[in-house]
């Protein structure tokens, strides 16, 4: 369908050469915005518009667009099988080719939808099969008793202090293990106790760094040594 006259539109927008060529002295191909216009166009717009309109009217409508939309876009309610579709006998070769093309496209769409539905059915079946082993595995895991770690419940706090080093570890952790001093540490502590019965905090820090002991160990050793010294007196 043609919306409007092509020749009038072409004459309205393409007529520009006659007035401007006389006014400016050279060929001007722009748009003429003046009121008066000549009938002749610079580009032969009338002939081009007439030939275009004649070609548009002479060209027959393509069969693909002349067919109803339901034949190409949507399948019929009860489609025939692919082997039973045949072209119309009264149509020409071109029209018959287009018809067979449209029918084959409709058939392929139907077959494709059938194939997609079958694939969806297979997918749902496989998903159900996958869900079934997963649920069975979960049920088996719930039925089986979970094995408890064998070594964790048997470890108690009093068992962890059997292998504590006796030289450089001190401080209370519940019931503290007995500290065993080396001969060098005992000798140095006895020397210090011989000169000073009581230690200042600064001297206690120095002895602790020198003997690789803690301040609490030094303090307790001096307390015990003073109690023994008072008892022996």
Curated annotation (Swiss-Prot):
Positions of region (Disordered): 1-101, 118-154
Listed Low complexity bias regions: 45-65, 133-145
Single GO cellular component term: nucleus
The keyword Nucleus is assigned to this record: yes
Subcellular location: Nucleus
Biased composition range(s): Polar residues: 1-11
GO biological process, one term: cell migration
Motif (Antp-type hexapeptide): 155-160
Family membership noted in the UniProt record: Belongs to the Antp homeobox family.
Function: Sequence-specific transcription factor which is part of a developmental regulatory system that provides cells with specific positional identities on the anterior-posterior axis. Also binds to its own promoter. Binds specifically to the motif 5'-CYYNATTA[TG]Y-3'.
Xref: PANTHER family: HOMEOBOX PROTEIN HOX, HOMEOBOX PROTEIN HOX-A5
Stated name of the protein: Homeobox protein Hox-A5
Organism listed in the record: Rattus norvegicus
Lineage, broadest ranks: Eukaryota, Metazoa, Chordata, Craniata, Vertebrata
Gene for this chain: Hoxa5
């Amino acid at each position: 369908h043609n919306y409007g006259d092509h020749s009038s539109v072409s004459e309205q927008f393409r007529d520009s050469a006659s007035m401007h060529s006389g006014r400016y002295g050279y060929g001007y191909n722009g748009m003429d915005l003046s009121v008066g216009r000549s009938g002749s166009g610079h580009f032969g717009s009338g002939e081009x518009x007439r030939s275009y309109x004649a070609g548009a009217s002479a060209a027959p409508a393509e069969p693909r667009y002349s067919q109803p939309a339901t034949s190409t876009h949507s399948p019929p309610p009860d489609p025939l099988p692919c082997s039973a579709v045949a072209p119309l006998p009264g149509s020409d070769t071109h029209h018959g080719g287009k018809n067979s093309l449209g029918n084959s496209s409709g058939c392929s769409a139907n077959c494709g939808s059938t194939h997609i539905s079958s694939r969806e059915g297979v997918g749902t079946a496989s998903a159900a099969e996958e869900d079934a082993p997963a649920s069975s595995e979960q049920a088996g895991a719930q039925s089986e008793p979970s094995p408890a770690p064998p070594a964790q419940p048997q470890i108690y706090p009093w068992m962890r202090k059997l292998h504590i080093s006796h030289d450089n570890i001190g401080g209370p952790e519940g019931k503290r293990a007995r500290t065993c001093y080396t001969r060098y540490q005992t000798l140095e502590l006895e020397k210090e106790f011989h000169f000073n019965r009581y230690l200042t905090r600064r001297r206690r820090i120095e002895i602790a760094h020198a003997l690789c002991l803690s301040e609490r160990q030094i303090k307790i050793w001096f307390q015990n040594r003073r109690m023994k010294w008072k008892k022996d007196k």
